[in-house]
């Protein structure tokens, strides 16, 4: 079984089946995903509260991928095992009216 790594350099903001797969895997392969934080780096450790007023909500919750699983067909249920999650050392949270 192979291991693949997808970096966070090509995020996309929503599920889109027209995007070409970044990697094609066989069932049982391992994929390591690097992800951006929820604002796609609009909020950084140096940000103050004022950054919330200028967030581009079209970039919120960036995704890494897509991954094509060989042999999978539309309607199939795929089992995914999350082996570990590692954070990048900081995080943020906000209550945003209307969001």
Feature-to-residue mapping (PLM):
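N-terminal, charged/glycine-rich beta-strand/loop interface patches
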Residues: 2-99
